[in-house]
Amino acid sequence: MAEKLNFDLVSPERLLFSGQVDMVVIPGSEGDMGIMAGHAPVMSTLRPGIIEVENEGAPRQRIFVRGGFAEVTPAGLTVLAEFTVPLADLDATALDREIALADKDVADAKNDDKRQSALEKLDHLKELRHTV
């Protein structure tokens, strides 16, 4: 039996998931990353996207995150997410609200760096909207 990964998914409101899994795919700022037990330590910011939790014998869990941070240590993976919702619960209306918030962030950006970051977030949300 393969070694399991300790995985914690935390939002500002609560601990959403804590357990041992086979693999987690996270939407890192530089691209998607598959994390398994024994992965090298790494920290990454998260872009809006889908976290996929894989566990042998169980359906794949897919969770939308609006951003946050991920840390891989020898103890496991911890994701601190700004906002999360299971993909099964995500509907077009909710995603449209997220897009509107991101659009406002673009308009309110105080400098070019913040505007670029907000535009990237908006682009990712629009891509996700096409999948719903």
From Swiss-Prot:
Q: Where in the chain are disulfide-linked cysteines found?
A: none
- Tell me which domain of life the UniProt entry assigns to the organism this sequence originates from: Bacteria
Recorded GO molecular functions are: ATP binding; proton-transporting ATP synthase activity, rotational mechanism
Protein topology in the membrane: Peripheral membrane protein
- Report the InterPro entries cross-referenced here: ATP_synth_F1_dsu/esu, ATP_synth_F1_dsu/esu_N, ATPsynth_dsu/esu_N
Where is it mainly found? membrane
Protein's UniProt keywords contain Transport:
yes
- Which subcellular locations apply to this protein? Cell inner membrane
Identify the GO cellular component terms for this protein.
plasma membrane; proton-transporting ATP synthase complex
Q: What keywords are assigned to this protein?
A: ATP synthesis, Cell inner membrane, Cell membrane, CF(1), Hydrogen ion transport, Ion transport, Membrane, Transport
Q: State the function annotated in the UniProt record.
A: Produces ATP from ADP in the presence of a proton gradient across the membrane.
Q: Which family does it belong to?
A: Belongs to the ATPase epsilon chain family.
Task: Give the multimer and partner information.
Answer: F-type ATPases have 2 components, CF(1) - the catalytic core - and CF(0) - the membrane proton channel. CF(1) has five subunits: alpha(3), beta(3), gamma(1), delta(1), epsilon(1). CF(0) has three main subunits: a, b and c.
The protein's matches in HAMAP family, at most eight in alphabetical order, are given as: ATP_synth_epsil_bac
> Protein name, please?
ATP synthase epsilon chain
